[in-house]
A protein has these predicted regions:
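Alpha-helical transmembrane bundles and membrane-interface segments of multipass inner-membrane proteins
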Residues: 1-161
Length: 161
């Protein structure tokens, strides 16, 4: 394996591990130390940090369909791995999007499989948005990276700029 290829894989694996570990540590700490619904920290006028158990997906869609959501999460993680192996993306932005999607999906899939809910804890005060977690942030940043890739870097046939 070439040095450039090793370095390419190293940053991707390192970032994925960092995100999943940070997601797990925050969620495990919150579950061990706080009650559901408890606000445990606050940034005045910006955000509350509160323990929420989300049995649904984004925006609490499909609430109480844990088995289906677990299956979808696991299939998404597996699909990303297969996509990465088959397409062998080389560009930074495309790889970043995949790593962020993978890490976020894996973090929430772990919750769904083990606990039957996802631990959420970040509640933005000035924006009416559902409570979320670090894995959710990774997924959103992955979507942003994917959009940037498609708009500015994708040179595939039919998508030339």
């Amino acid at each position: 394996m070439k040095k450039k290829n090793i370095l390419n894989w190293a940053w991707q694996i390192g970032l994925a591990l960092l995100i999943v570990v940070l997601d797990r540590v925050t969620k495990d700490s919150i579950m061990a130390n706080y009650s559901v619904g408890e606000v445990f920290a606050e940034i005045p006028f910006v955000a509350d940090f509160m323990y929420v158990q989300n049995t649904g997906a984004a925006f609490s869609l499909l609430s109480d369909n844990t088995m289906l959501l677990s299956l979808i999460s696991i299939l998404f993680v597996v699909a990303l791995v297969i996509y990465k192996i088959v397409t062998k993306p080389q560009g930074f932005m495309q790889n970043l999007a995949i790593v962020l999607f993978f890490s976020g999906a894996l973090g929430n899939a772990i919750d769904r499989v083990i606990y039957k809910f996802v631990v959420d804890f970040i509640d933005i005060k000035w924006f009416n948005f559902p409570v979320f977690n670090i894995a959710d942030i990774a997924i959103v940043l992955g979507a942003v990276a994917a959009i940037i890739f498609v708009l500015f870097f994708d040179k595939s046939e039919g998508n030339k700029r």
